[in-house]
Curated annotation (Swiss-Prot):
Protein name as catalogued: Myrmicitoxin(1)-Pr4b
Similarity section: Belongs to the formicidae venom clade 2 family.
Coiled coil, from the record: none
Tissue occurrence: Expressed by the venom gland.
Keyword Phosphoprotein: no
Propiece span(s): 24-33
Assigned keywords, A-Z: Amidation, Neurotoxin, Secreted, Signal, Toxin
Signal peptide positions on this chain: 1-23
């Protein structure tokens, strides 16, 4: 069950939060043409920390 919740949390981050942070004009789940490599270069460490925090909250 926790794994499912974690998966949804990660998908939410990827589909909604990242496009908004990266300034994608059509931010949201439908903005599929995002260049993830560019985003990871810009905010890789922050994103990894955010995902780690989410995982810790779910497991802890």
């Amino acid at each position: 069950m926790k794994a499912i919740i974690f998966l949804f949390a990660v998908l939410t981050v990827v589909a909604i939060i990242i496009p908004i942070i990266s300034g994608e004009p059509n931010a949201g789940p439908h903005a599929a043409s995002i260049d993830l490599n560019e985003i990871m270069k810009k905010m890789g460490p922050d994103l990894l920390k955010m995902l780690d925090d989410i995982k810790t909250k779910i497991q802890g």
